[in-house]
Amino acid sequence: MPRLLIAASGTGGHLFPALSVADALPAGWSAHWLGVPDRLETTLVPERYPLTTVNAGGLQGRGLKKVVQLLRLLAASRDVRRLIRRNGIDVVFTTGGYIAAPAILGARWSGVPVVLHESNAIPGRVTRLLGRACTQVAIGLPAAARRIPGCKAIVTGTPVRNSFLQTQTLPDWVPQGPGPLLVVMGGSQGALGLNRMVRPLLPMLLSEGCRVVHLTGSNDPDVNSIKHPGFAERPFSDAIPALLQHADLAISRAGAGSLSELAVSGTPTVLVPFPQAADRHQDANAACAAALGAAVIVHQHGPSEPTLRQTLWRLLGPRLRSCDSAADPLVSMAQAMGTLAEADADQQLAALLQGLVR
């Protein structure tokens, strides 16, 4: 029975692709999860896989602080090596983040192959520092390859949840009607800035017949400020697969996970990169979609600036005016977004892991 150690921690962007890969493995495989205390995995993972946690963190400090962090990394790597030996692990898979460093070092010290998945167009610090130590680096976007010279890189795409690959029905709370459906979602971080940019424009779109679903996040002080039969507002929703499949247009941040979900759904999108993202990696992610004609990039700006308003009217205007498809830019955008998709990314990664087991 092949044994896999999955090191994925912190956010849905790290956890959900790893869960998809674990689900794609054939019967007969067993998986053990490596995470960090008090993170999302401690609630999502234990009901499905045995979970071991280690204290892992970054190396951003200086002087004594950095020495302490380095010692903590070495201790965590030692713990991972013990875990690998105790459980007879055959291969390690990690999706990056803080937990990836001790997972990679522990695997190499144990002589076990390790696969690192990098979802962003600009690889993270762990990928840049330790990618060469990995047996294989799987990348979600082709643009990442040139930024990690010396790594054994292969393009697999970023796995999405199975619900995105199945036809979904819109829930009853979504506004009904003939007008185009606009879905606004800010993701787990950065929703507030996006909301402040988008919300002043929604009354105009609603008055023209557009239907709008706005996923605001949990900390927006201006929720319930818009009342309209064509408008629905929620902090979060489990119906994102259905929303994206049926949306005429989405407004979204440009995280790698969101971009993969938009791609497999074929959803034309206005991408607003989160300006505080590390290394501005969301700008690079968005550029990959824009280069294909699948998305339009609008950088975050104040509500009085016209850029987003002009973009939305250019994209949605033909459908609001019932023009023929030849004048509709969303048709070609949807087709282009589909070319960005790697719907079988989980299967590709599962096959890669299987090929590394002796």
Swiss-Prot record:
Coiled coil: none annotated. Its main location: membrane. It is found in: Cell inner membrane. GO terms for molecular function: UDP-N-acetyl-D-glucosamine:N-acetylmuramoyl-L-alanyl-D-glutamyl-meso-2,6-diaminopimelyl-D-alanyl-D-alanine-diphosphoundecaprenol 4-beta-N-acetylglucosaminlytransferase activity; undecaprenyldiphospho-muramoylpentapeptide beta-N-acetylglucosaminyltransferase activity. Keywords: Cell cycle, Cell division, Cell inner membrane, Cell membrane, Cell shape, Cell wall biogenesis/degradation, Glycosyltransferase, Membrane, Peptidoglycan synthesis, Transferase. SUPFAM superfamilies: UDP-Glycosyltransferase/glycogen phosphorylase. Pathway: Cell wall biogenesis; peptidoglycan biosynthesis. InterPro entries: GlcNAc_MurG, Glyco_trans_28_C, GlycoTrans_28_N. The keyword Glycosyltransferase applies. Its EC number is 2.4.1.227. GO terms for biological process: carbohydrate metabolic process; cell division; cell wall organization; lipid glycosylation; peptidoglycan biosynthetic process; regulation of cell shape. The keyword NAD does not apply. UDP-N-acetyl-alpha-D-glucosamine binds at T11, G12, G13, N120, R161, S188, Q282. It catalyses: di-trans,octa-cis-undecaprenyl diphospho-N-acetyl-alpha-D-muramoyl-L-alanyl-D-glutamyl-meso-2,6-diaminopimeloyl-D-alanyl-D-alanine + UDP-N-acetyl-alpha-D-glucosamine = di-trans,octa-cis-undecaprenyl diphospho-[N-acetyl-alpha-D-glucosaminyl-(1->4)]-N-acetyl-alpha-D-muramoyl-L-alanyl-D-glutamyl-meso-2,6-diaminopimeloyl-D-alanyl-D-alanine + UDP + H(+). It is a peripheral membrane protein. GO terms for cellular component: plasma membrane. Belongs to the glycosyltransferase 28 family. MurG subfamily. Cell wall formation. Catalyzes the transfer of a GlcNAc subunit on undecaprenyl-pyrophosphoryl-MurNAc-pentapeptide (lipid intermediate I) to form undecaprenyl-pyrophosphoryl-MurNAc-(pentapeptide)GlcNAc (lipid intermediate II). PANTHER family: GLYCOSYLTRANSFERASE (PTHR21015:SF22), UDP-N-ACETYLGLUCOSAMINE--N-ACETYLMURAMYL-(PENTAPEPTIDE) PYROPHOSPHORYL-UNDECAPRENOL N-ACETYLGLUCOSAMINE TRANSFERASE 1 (PTHR21015). This is UDP-N-acetylglucosamine--N-acetylmuramyl-(pentapeptide) pyrophosphoryl-undecaprenol N-acetylglucosamine transferase. It comes from Synechococcus sp. (strain WH7803). The gene is murG.
